[in-house]
């Protein structure tokens, strides 16, 4: 016969276990019910400041920069990459990073800017509107903003949950953006879809003086996959879209974070073994077979600089680095140069990349 005192202890334990099951079950139900994909072929709002058209046979510069929601200072290691941190250090730190990013971009004065991982309203960045702040700093540009992360509240890590995020990609152009469109990409089918971004690319149609269009694509392809299969499917969709635009006579430039090893073997180039980082697979060159498109991987053979660090802890000289940020161009775009800015990962786990080019007349 079980003593009365023991029965009470067992009862309390069972109540605690039941409460825990109900809490966890309720949270899982909340995440699954709240989950949704953002509508495909969604027209984007254009912040219109200019009616100027881009010119042919004129050199322009485009910069792509994944700013890591303004959290990835050199001391930051992200929990999903093997680090411990889930939020920016503070709101003040977020503002300082955005200010630094804006100052850098203003000093370079590119004609086009593609920015990934920009928070509008997120727990992880203390609800600071990074998109509005950057637009206010970067005057004289038309712009579009494309949402690719509208997540439920992620209650992990328990000590400081990542929280809820509303974020996306910002595209800026010194020339008139006629229209903008959001295209949804294939994503993971399993659990990862609940914590990964709602992958997409934006399509911004820029006026050109010869009555054609420069079709500008801003992208952030999938990471956290075991073999890069989904990212390849995403890339294939983008290539097909760009090829169709080229065949209409338009100019095409895509840029952003491909989450692929654009240098094929960054580990060898930068002297740090990347065998354990299977998400960073090279781009399959056969994807471009039969197309009028080519990959542009930012690289200086004499002084190679990586565009990304694996944020499994604070930045250090032994951390795995690679180049995942770059561009795709159509054959009627002549590229004169492309490289990585060596900012030492001061503002993000990415360094910005650039490409100079001309639209062929």
State where each predicted segment sits.
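Surface-exposed cleft-lining segments at the edges of enzyme active sites
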Residues: 84-90, 118-120, 185-193, 220-229
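N-terminal, active-site-proximal structural segment of metallo-dependent hydrolase catalytic domains
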Residues: 2-137, 145-166, 361
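Active-site beta-strand/loop signature of hydrolases that rely on acidic residues for catalysis
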Residues: 61-67, 100-127, 172, 204-206, ...
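Short proline/glycine-enriched turn/loop segments at secondary-structure junctions
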Residues: 192-193, 313-318, 342-346
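A well-ordered secondary-structure block
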Residues: 150-214, 218
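Metal-dependent phosphoesterases centered on the DNase I-like endonuclease/exonuclease/phosphatase
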Residues: 226-331
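Short hydrophobic/aromatic beta-strand or adjacent loop that forms the aromatic wall/cage
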Residues: 166-169, 197-203, 321-326, 349-354
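Conserved beta strand-loop-helix elements of the APE1-like EEP
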Residues: 136-139, 164-180, 318-334, 358
């Amino acid at each position: 016969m079980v003593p009365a005192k023991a029965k009470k202890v067992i009862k309390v334990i069972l109540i605690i276990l039941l409460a825990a099951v109900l809490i966890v079950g309720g949270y899982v139900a909340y995440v699954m019910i709240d989950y949704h994909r953002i509508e495909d072929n969604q027209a984007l709002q254009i912040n219109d400041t200019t009616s100027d058209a881009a010119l042919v046979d004129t050199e322009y510069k485009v910069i792509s920069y994944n700013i890591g929601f303004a959290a990835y200072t050199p001391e930051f290691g992200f929990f999903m990459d093997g680090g411990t941190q889930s939020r920016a250090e503070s709101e003040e730190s977020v503002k300082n990073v955005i200010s630094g990013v804006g100052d850098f971009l203003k000093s370079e004065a590119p004609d086009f800017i593609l920015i990934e991982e920009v928070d509008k309203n997120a727990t992880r960045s203390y609800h600071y509107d990074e998109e509005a702040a950057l637009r206010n700093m970067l005057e004289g540009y038309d712009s579009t903003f494309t949402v690719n992360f509208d997540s439920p509240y992620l209650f992990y890590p328990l000590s400081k949950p990542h929280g809820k995020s509303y974020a996306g990609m910002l595209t800026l152009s010194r020339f008139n953006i006629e229209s903008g469109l959001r295209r949804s990409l294939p994503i993971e089918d399993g659990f990862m879809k609940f914590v990964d971004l709602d992958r997409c690319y934006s399509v911004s149609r820029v006026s050109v003086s010869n009555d054609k269009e420069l079709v500008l694509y801003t992208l952030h392809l999938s990471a956290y996959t075991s073999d890069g299969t989904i990212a390849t499917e995403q890339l294939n969709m983008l290539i097909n879209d760009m090829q169709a635009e080229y065949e209409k006579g338009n100019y095409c430039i895509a840029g952003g974070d491909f989450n692929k090893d654009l240098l094929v073997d960054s580990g060898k180039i930068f002297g740090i073994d990347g065998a354990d980082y299977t998400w960073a697979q090279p781009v399959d060159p056969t994807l471009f077979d039969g197309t009028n498109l080519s990959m542009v991987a930012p690289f200086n053979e004499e002084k190679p600089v990586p565009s990304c660090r694996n944020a499994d802890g604070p930045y250090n000289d032994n951390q795995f680095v690679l180049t995942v940020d770059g561009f795709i161009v159509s054959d009627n775009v002549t590229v004169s140069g492309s490289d990585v800015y060596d900012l030492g990962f001061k503002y993000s786990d990415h360094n910005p990349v650039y490409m100079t080019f001309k639209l062929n007349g």
